Amino acid sequence: MSVVRIGPYTLPNRLILAPMAGVTDRPFRQLCRRLGAGMVVSEMVTSDVRLWNSRKSRLRLIHDGEDEPRSVQIAGGDPAMLAEAAQRNVELGAQIIDINMGCPAKKVCNKAAGSALLRDEALVAEILDAVVRAVDVPVTLKIRTGWDRDNRNGVTVAKLAEQAGIQALAVHGRTRADLYTGEAEYETIAAIKQAVSIPVFANGDIDSPEKARKVIEQTGVDALLIGRAAQGRPWIFREIDHYLRTGEHLPAAPLPEVQSILLEHLAELHLFYGEEMGVRIARKHVGWYLATLPGAREFRAQFNRLQDTDAQCASVRQFFAERQNNGTGVAA
């Protein structure tokens, strides 16, 4: 199995937690790393450092004690601001800077950031050059295959990235116009891999060990970014890693382990964010963890009304105790 290198860093495997706003916070990053991710990437941080004083932004800038390499994603459309944001994040502990040109969200694209940048290749080149020159750590880039299906310029952008000194390129197999609808396509990613010599990572709909192997075989990529499939299933990294190494499946996670992982995650969320914010953020994660289990919808309705950390943890323990007593088995 090929070794993945980003600048001076060698990853322990080919699986990376994709950056997701509102999801890949410090508690989730650390959990995914413990459960098999070779690298994790922070939530997107705005390049406008004037906005970093909000509590939400300050929490996104905390990386103390995290495993190396610490990769931080920045987003924006102004080369000078992105360069400054990169420098500031390195001062705060970032060891890799990732530039977001892949987010399709309207509130990002309307600010000429994220995947909106793919429409302006000259600006793309200017941004990449500015950020690479600004820092002495590896800079990576995340893109989509293009703006829409008639304008798949991923190969062109990949070549610009390589020329600018980008150390690795992640490609989501949809266009900006696709958002998250339909199925990801990997032909463009395969073409990008053939067109450049820097490491290329595939992203999009990689939700099982078999799909992971199929995408690697189809594209020849160096690594995979896993995003939405890890929500409520952070152990997917060890499952895929084991399958890629051995060709065999690990047993499904038993309910007692799922309970233990979820309670650990809740405790870290409550500690990191404080009670009020932690309780609120925990709700979506609990929904993801329990989505495939019987009675999850009814449980979520009452869980989302709980207002304190102790009640949340007690409620989760009761949910799992009832299912283990009923012999409901394992998680998906």
Curated annotation (Swiss-Prot):
InterPro entries given in the database record: Aldolase_TIM, DUS-like_FMN-bd, DUS_fam, DusB, DusB-like, tRNA-dHydroUridine_Synthase_C, tRNA_hU_synthase_CS
Chain's gene name: dusB
Database matches in PANTHER family: TRNA-DIHYDROURIDINE(47) SYNTHASE [NAD(P)(+)]-LIKE (PTHR45846:SF1)
Catalyzed reactions: a 5,6-dihydrouridine in tRNA + NAD(+) = a uridine in tRNA + NADH + H(+); a 5,6-dihydrouridine in tRNA + NADP(+) = a uridine in tRNA + NADPH + H(+)
Role this protein plays: Catalyzes the synthesis of 5,6-dihydrouridine (D), a modified base found in the D-loop of most tRNAs, via the reduction of the C5-C6 double bond in target uridines.
Enzyme Commission (EC) number: 1.3.1.-
This protein's record includes keyword Oxidoreductase: yes
Superkingdom of this protein's organism: Bacteria
EC class: oxidoreductase
Species of origin: Pseudomonas aeruginosa (strain ATCC 15692 / DSM 22644 / CIP 104116 / JCM 14847 / LMG 12228 / 1C / PRS 101 / PAO1)
Cofactor annotation: FMN
Pfam families, A to Z: Dus (PF01207)
NCBIfam families named in the record: nifR3_yhdG
Keywords: Flavoprotein, FMN, NADP, Oxidoreductase, RNA-binding, tRNA processing, tRNA-binding
UniProt name for this protein: tRNA-dihydrouridine synthase B
Active site positions: 103 (proton donor)
Family statement: Belongs to the Dus family. DusB subfamily.
Residues binding FMN, per UniProt: 19-21, 73, 142, 203-205, 227-228
